[in-house]
């Protein structure tokens, strides 16, 4: 068996109905669109969320909240991901070099998820309480 020889089981796929191809097909003339009306026309139909002229739900409800711009440039890094970084001193630039965080990130917070198996020094990164305890238990330290 090879990927280029795979095919669906016999009878599993049905050919699509060819509409508008004569009255004998059962889907000729109006092709299942009915008579007249907006939906029978070429390009007919209404946009998503349109409620027939009634004020739509997305406009009846008030706006709320916002997207924090700082959250967009802040990354969370798991303890287990620190193993992907070479060297003992880990800072923002070494995380970017190891492709652990994206190049557009300006802040990093290390969270307790997984385990750290070597002594590392974190420099200039924010760390949660649980992650701090795990790093210090492994013999590492955190420098602000």
UniProtKB/Swiss-Prot annotation:
Protein's name in the database: Large ribosomal subunit protein uL15
A GO molecular-function descriptor: rRNA binding
Gene transcribed to yield this protein: rplO
Keywords: Ribonucleoprotein, Ribosomal protein, RNA-binding, rRNA-binding
Subunit structure: Part of the 50S ribosomal subunit.
Listed PANTHER family: 50S RIBOSOMAL PROTEIN L15 (PTHR12934), LARGE RIBOSOMAL SUBUNIT PROTEIN UL15M (PTHR12934:SF11)
SUPFAM superfamilies in the record: Ribosomal proteins L15p and L18e
Region of interest (Disordered), ranges: 1-52
Pfam families reported in the protein's UniProt record: Ribosomal_L27A
Residue ranges, compositional bias (Gly residues): 21-31
GO biological process, one term: translation
HAMAP family the record matches: Ribosomal_uL15 (MF_01341)
GO cellular component, one term: cytosolic large ribosomal subunit
Role played: Binds to the 23S rRNA.
Family: Belongs to the universal ribosomal protein uL15 family.
């Amino acid at each position: 068996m090879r990927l280029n020889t795979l095919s669906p089981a016999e009878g599993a796929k049905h050919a699509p109905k060819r509409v508008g191809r004569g009255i004998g097909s059962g889907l000729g003339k109006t092709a299942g669109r009915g008579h007249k009306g907006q939906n029978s026309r070429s390009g007919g139909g209404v946009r998503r969320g349109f409620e027939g002229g009634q004020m739509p739900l997305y406009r009846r409800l008030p706006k709320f909240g916002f997207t924090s711009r700082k959250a967009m440039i802040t990354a969370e890094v798991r303890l287990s991901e620190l193993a992907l970084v070479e060297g003992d001193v880990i800072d923002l630039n070494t995380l970017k070099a190891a492709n652990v965080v994206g190049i557009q990130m300006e802040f990093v917070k290390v969270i307790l998820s997984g385990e750290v198996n070597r002594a590392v020094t974190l420099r200039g990164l924010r760390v949660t309480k649980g992650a701090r305890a795990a790093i210090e238990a492994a013999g590492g330290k955190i420098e602000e």
